[in-house]
Amino acid sequence: MIRKKKKVKKIRGSRTCGGGSHKKRRGAGNKGGRGMAGGHKHKWTWIIKYCPDYFGKYGFKRHPSLVKRLETINVGELEEIVLKNPDKFEKEDDKFVVDVIELGYEKVLGKGKVTIPMIVKAVEVSEKAREKIEAVGGEVVEL
C-alpha cells in the first residue's frame, strides 16, 4: 500500500506551487519570447554564436518549370531490355539498334555491364556509358 503523499497535494494552497518567486514561471515572457522571437534584438548574441546563417539571403531556387530533368536509364538496364526482347530491335551489322527515346528515356548512364554490341541513339550519353558501349564494339549516336 502506497503511503507517500503526492507532490501536487503538498503544493496545493501555496501561491506559486513550487515555482519559486511569483515572477518566475510566467510563460514565454519569462524566456524572452517564444521560439526565435527577439533574434534581431535581445537574443542577437545567441544567434551570432549558434546560428550565424539564420538571417540573410543565400542563393535561390529555380522555378520547377525551368529546371530541365532528363529521364535516365543505365547501360546495364538497356542491355537487359535488349536481351529480353531481341525481336523488338532492328539489327545493323550484327549490332542492335536501340533508340532510347522510343523507350521513354533521354539520357544513358554508365552503371552496369555491356556484353553485346549496340548502336545507342540518345539525347545525351555519359562518358562512362560511351566507354562501355564502344569497348564491346558498339556505337553512340547523340541526337
From Swiss-Prot:
Would I find RNA-binding among this entry's keywords? Answer: yes
Composition-biased stretches, type Basic residues, lie in: 1-13
GO cellular component labels: large ribosomal subunit
| A Gene Ontology BP annotation from the UniProt entry | translation
What GO MF annotations does this protein's record show?
rRNA binding; structural constituent of ribosome
Q: Could you tell me the superkingdom of the organism this chain comes from?
A: Archaea
Record bears the keyword Ribonucleoprotein? yes
- InterPro entries according to UniProt: Rbsml_uL15_N (IPR027386), Ribosomal_uL15 (IPR030878), Ribosomal_uL15/eL18 (IPR021131), Ribosomal_uL15/eL18_sf (IPR036227), Ribosomal_uL15_CS (IPR001196)
What PROSITE patterns does its record include?
RIBOSOMAL_L15
- For the region Disordered, give the residue spans: 1-39
Q: Which HAMAP family match?
A: Ribosomal_uL15 (MF_01341)
**Which family is this protein grouped under?**
Belongs to the universal ribosomal protein uL15 family.
Q: How does it assemble?
A: Part of the 50S ribosomal subunit.
What's the protein called, per UniProt? Large ribosomal subunit protein uL15
**Species:** Methanocaldococcus jannaschii (strain ATCC 43067 / DSM 2661 / JAL-1 / JCM 10045 / NBRC 100440)
Gene name of this polypeptide? rpl15
